[in-house]
Amino acid sequence: MTGPAVQDQELDQFDKKILDIIQTGFPLEPRPYAVIGDAVGLTEAEALARVRALKERKIIRRLGANFNSWKLGFRSTLCAAKVPEDKFDEFVAEVNSHVGVTHNYLRAHAYNVWFTFIGPSWEEVCSTLDSITQKTGIPILNLPAEELYKIRVDFKMDEDPAAD
């Protein structure tokens, strides 16, 4: 489901610097790749080409803004399902067809499919989960958060590991 680990792939100093910038402070400018290029010593076209290459190599999975969905009125939940092997592809295809699915993982457990779902209201979340169950015949365990904890993780790429 995922590509090779980043440490298994060659990253030069330009790639590492670009990754640091886009993780922590993507420029909100009319020409962000020109700003990134200037910061790392490349042209705008070179910076953009490197970001595209990192995305193609699956080192960058997603490039976009993160919002506090709770403050915007959205609701989310962690979901789990016991999916028989013969229904796996059908179930995963149905789950992934919904724009509110933000993560979807296969686990070695009785509840073998785990995913998170976000919607504009709690009613919409529950309605969508009910719809998935009706279409697939597979019940979904709905585990809404009682309290939200956000942990920010930035993977510092342009550091000398020997400096620690």
Swiss-Prot record:
Disulfide bonds: none annotated. It is an enzyme of class 4 (lyase). One of its GO terms (molecular function) is lyase activity. Pathway: Porphyrin-containing compound metabolism; protoheme biosynthesis. Keywords: Heme biosynthesis, Lyase. Pfam families: AsnC_trans_reg2, NirdL-like_HTH. Coiled coil: none annotated. InterPro entries: AsnC_trans_reg2, HTH-Siroheme_Decarb, NirdL-like_HTH, Siroheme_Decarboxylase, Tscrpt_reg_AsnC-like, WH-like_DNA-bd_sf, WH_DNA-bd_sf. It catalyses: siroheme + 2 H(+) = 12,18-didecarboxysiroheme + 2 CO2. Transmembrane segments: none annotated. GO terms for biological process: heme biosynthetic process. Its EC number is 4.1.1.111. Belongs to the Ahb/Nir family. Involved in siroheme-dependent heme b biosynthesis. Catalyzes the decarboxylation of siroheme into didecarboxysiroheme. NCBIfam families: Siroheme_Dcarb_AhbA. Forms a heterodimer composed of AhbA and AhbB. PANTHER family: SIROHEME DECARBOXYLASE NIRL SUBUNIT, TRANSCRIPTIONAL REGULATOR, ASNC FAMILY. This is Siroheme decarboxylase alpha subunit. It comes from Oleidesulfovibrio alaskensis (strain ATCC BAA-1058 / DSM 17464 / G20). The lineage of its organism: Bacteria, Pseudomonadati, Thermodesulfobacteriota, Desulfovibrionia, Desulfovibrionales.
